[in-house]
Amino acid sequence: MTEYKKVIAQNKKALFNYFIEERLEAGIVLKGSEVQSLRQGKASIEESHAADTGHEVFLYNCHIAEYEKANRFNHSTRRPRKLLLHTKEIKKIIGRIRIKGYTLVALSMYFNKKNKVKVELGIAKGKKLHDKRESIKEKDWKRDQSRLIRQK
């Protein structure tokens, strides 16, 4: 059975630049104008990442556009946003990202079936240049395979 997800934003660049070793789902603390802007699909997580500050995890550099109909109560577009995780998950994440070379990257942002905004995070390790070339070759080979299958 598949879950309902209305995807708001995806970080395709992260899948190219990192090896994703583990995926997690986290809630996010938002203001009302941010939620309204997300409902219109005005968000970008291309350059966003998450980091720990003691016993909490925050999402940095996530751009949520200002909501036009909100007056003076509008939000800052790139403010750090707190991620909602269980304490056990936070400790596990902190342990993993303290290892050299690992980072916590936002992969996608979506509404779940209860209309709550969720962020899919990935514990990732950066790819080297030759790894990126290999992934491009694999992608091209899969595309060529599908073309050959369609021609037959």
From Swiss-Prot:
**Main localization, broad class:** cytoplasm
The reply on keyword RNA-binding is yes
Annotated InterPro entries: SmpB, SsrA-bd_prot, SsrA-bd_prot_CS
Q: State its location(s).
A: Cytoplasm
Give the record's GO CC terms.
cytosol
PANTHER family from the UniProt entry: SSRA-BINDING PROTEIN, TMRNA-BINDING COMPONENT OF TRANS-TRANSLATION TAGGING COMPLEX
Give the protein's function.
Answer: Required for rescue of stalled ribosomes mediated by trans-translation. Binds to transfer-messenger RNA (tmRNA), required for stable association of tmRNA with ribosomes. tmRNA and SmpB together mimic tRNA shape, replacing the anticodon stem-loop with SmpB. tmRNA is encoded by the ssrA gene; the 2 termini fold to resemble tRNA(Ala) and it encodes a 'tag peptide', a short internal open reading frame. During trans-translation Ala-aminoacylated tmRNA acts like a tRNA, entering the A-site of stalled ribosomes, displacing the stalled mRNA.
Name by which UniProt lists this protein = SsrA-binding protein
Organism equals Rickettsia felis (strain ATCC VR-1525 / URRWXCal2) (Rickettsia azadi)
